[in-house]
From Swiss-Prot:
PANTHER family: CDC68 RELATED, FACT COMPLEX SUBUNIT SPT16
GO biological process: chromatin organization; DNA repair; DNA-templated DNA replication; nucleosome assembly; nucleosome organization; positive regulation of RNA polymerase II transcription preinitiation complex assembly; positive regulation of transcription initiation by RNA polymerase II; regulation of chromatin organization
Lineage top rank: taxon: Eukaryota
Name of protein: FACT complex subunit SPT16
Biased composition (Basic and acidic residues): 480-496, 1020-1035
Function: Component of the FACT complex, a general chromatin factor that acts to reorganize nucleosomes. The FACT complex is involved in multiple processes that require DNA as a template such as mRNA elongation, DNA replication and DNA repair. During transcription elongation the FACT complex acts as a histone chaperone that both destabilizes and restores nucleosomal structure.
Misc. remarks from the entry: Present with 18500 molecules/cell in log phase SD medium.
Main location: nucleus
Amino acid sequence: MEELNIDFDVFKKRIELLYSKYNEFEGSPNSLLFVLGSSNAENPYQKTTILHNWLLSYEFPATLIALVPGKVIIITSSAKAKHLQKAIDLFKDPESKITLELWQRNNKEPELNKKLFDDVIALINSAGKTVGIPEKDSYQGKFMTEWNPVWEAAVKENEFNVIDISLGLSKVWEVKDVNEQAFLSVSSKGSDKFMDLLSNEMVRAVDEELKITNAKLSDKIENKIDDVKFLKQLSPDLSALCPPNYKFNFDLLDWTYSPIIQSGKKFDLRVSARSTNDQLYGNGCILASCGIRYNNYCSNITRTFLIDPSEEMANNYDFLLTLQKEIVTNILKPGRTPKEVYESVIEYIEKTKPELVPNFTKNIGSLIGLEFRDSNFILNVKNDYRKIQRGDCFNISFGFNNLKDSQSANNYALQLADTVQIPLDETEPPRFLTNYTKAKSQISFYFNNEEEDNNKKKSSPATKVPSKPDRNSKILRTKLRGEARGGAEDAQKEQIRKENQKKLHEKLEKNGLLRFSAADANGPDSEPRQYFKKYESYVRDSQLPTNIRDLRIHVDWKSQTIILPIYGRPVPFHINSYKNGSKNEEGEYTYLRLNFNSPGSSGGISKKVEELPYEESADNQFVRSITLRSKDGDRMSETFKQIADLKKEATKREQERKALADVVQQDKLIENKTGRTKRLDQIFVRPNPDTKRVPSTVFIHENGIRFQSPLRTDSRIDILFSNIKNLIFQSCKGELIVVIHIHLKNPILMGKKKIQDVQFYREASDMSVDETGGGRRGQSRFRRYGDEDELEQEQEERRKRAALDKEFKYFADAIAEASNGLLTVENTFRDLGFQGVPNRSAVFCMPTTDCLVQLIEPPFLVINLEEVEICILERVQFGLKNFDMVFVYKDFNKPVTHINTVPIESLDFLKQWLTDMDIPYTVSTINLNWATIMKSLQDDPYQFFLDGGWNFLATGSDDEASDESEEEVSEYEASEDDVSDESAFSEDEEGSEVDDDISGDESEDYTGDESEEGEDWDELEKKAARADRGANFRD
């Protein structure tokens, strides 16, 4: 059992403090009662949870604590009681006023638990009728299910006067001791570090005009708490602030709340604010808030970043800084009430800038510690019943909202928040625990001047149309069979696209150097990140199988162990230590050689292997191999086969474990028990958890959706809103089904299968389709209706499809609405789609607002465009009718995505679409070896970008190099072999189309002197096709 690091001296000191103070609580309770059910990660600031953290530094679920005169009773499980056993001796001291009793409950004996509950209620009743509890606490779980009926009955029977003790508890843990102040310093330093990361990401997004929402930028920062490499970089600064005898542990770092980023024209300065799904607005001001907690002690920091501010905004920000200094230095004094503090702040504003008084926040912060916002100690005009004391720690948070800039007429807001400690020493002034820069020069950024200068420099060349591409464009248009486009307007668009791509490539290279450093290298010279996974066959001798007494080789499948008889004793070898073996027969003996993992065997362990097969140490001794012989050949053969099968099974199990390593256990779905649950009936799901395909139902609940199969109650799929990355609706227009597609952030398990996409669909039409082309003649025997009936049938089908689209679109919108802003519905744009082969078969790919998708034929394709680093268009060369697309992701560990065999007619459109989506692309005439490219990129990404990044490809795609290659191609003269090859390729597909093209549209395009240019490619192809057909007839 893992040993918990509980400081029992602190536990005794604090529980005695609580015992000595509770008689002074409002309402004079005779006893205190704290009941904690299951842990609630959604609300970690309930009073009982805070009490556990204050006393033990841990939360003990399913535990009851009662304080009655002379004793403290704790009812908990036997496993948790073992951790608290040491505390009992501390309370046996004769000077101690109370004793501690541990009562152990048992989940399997509800009658015993009820007796314990009755006994503790009897003690409470004997203490008096007034019982103090935290009334607003609300817990769930089996423990609460057992306790609540007993307590409710006892309250009625004994006529208990139950009172709320939240205010009294707030006063008990208000003053922070030295250790608590140290924990607050650690958490505050963590907030500084994450604010620095947030500001860098925010400034980069504004500077590069990235299309990112406030919420997505917030999620990006929030996910950094799971980045072990980043946390290790913070460790030296944070560990120096820890209390003596407390070792820093970055696993104790967590978010107080999700980072809040606000931009645009609407701002919320309350602590309950959330990041919106609006685009990050890089003008005016951006408010950013971070809160980190360490060992459950909270901190908070808020900064205002000014983007191209006017003089009025800058002056008001200067006043904000002055006001903060005034509050902390001169107003926040021990002995004053929050009402006096707030009124003093208002007086100062009225004296200095009276026009800002209506815009000032209704409070200037609150007490902070184990509770992020103590509602019983808010610094506002209503709080006249508390007084500031030495040792208090405050989140000083205030600002001005709904300000209007006279220059731009835009709304803006200013806000500052810092964690401030009032020291225990009277000679020391209040101390800022959060120290991230707030100086105006450091938080102000100016971009407009630079952009205006750049626009002036680039305005003249941007409108200039070069003459050289104009000549080549005609040739290119003919060879690729695209639509006829010409003139200066098309050439100008092409030039603009090239310039935009050039900027995107420059930005890509610049970002690469910013994202990576030399420390990110993971090449052959870097230190391998390898580890050893411990294993154990048996803990005690009694666990060995009973049949080992025959001193034969045994294979214990249950313990994954080979048991060998050595010197008359069974010696276990875990299958993980076994490498390979061999079996040979020599004379009457059969020899079995077993080789084990050991240092130095087979040239050592490759650096590519992450998991070491053994733990190398100077103290360890290894067995390299063991050879056994026996006259019982059949027995040895059977044993060798069992060992081989056990090794295969262990290897397979380990591969499955690694494959499912990225599967995240979702939180529990909270069912909607109030109001009407929205549902969508008669739908099918892909993939299907059942073997049979039957219509089912999907429900919308409080924090997610649930697909429920009618076949079995346990056959269902729960998807939380927080795990949905993309919610996509695809109409049945042009398709046989209507679809709501859900692409997940983290895969979930369906049985033993890992899935990242879940799709709900319904077939759009159940009508039979006549594919014979015979009309009524083909089925006159069965169909007697005329054209009017057929027309009415078609109209009815259109109505059904429209109603189906409306029903599914309404349900998709309902999912987005229930997510409280986490999700938005994306629609597919069929008009922008194109054919391609992302897997094995040709499908129709379509873009949405943020993705490129294929949702009709499994396996589905969902490419998030914001995750794409670059797109490479491969096999783009003269004479080929299709090309390939390769998407490289910003996460270089993620495999690239191929979409093959895209028609060449889509090339120009896709180039423009990629440019519009701010995705740089390059063009290659060949298929590249992506395994080699990505391997070099992963080994040392910093050196990759230092050497020019993606410039090793055809940078800018449509650059001058491609133009020159086109000129060379235009002088190509076809040989007989080449012509016959091309005609053979196109004969079946284009035979009749070539004639139509030459006699129709193509002839109208060429109004110049064709005698100088000679026959074009289509004409040569046509002749070759006729020649081949003639040769076939002769044959």
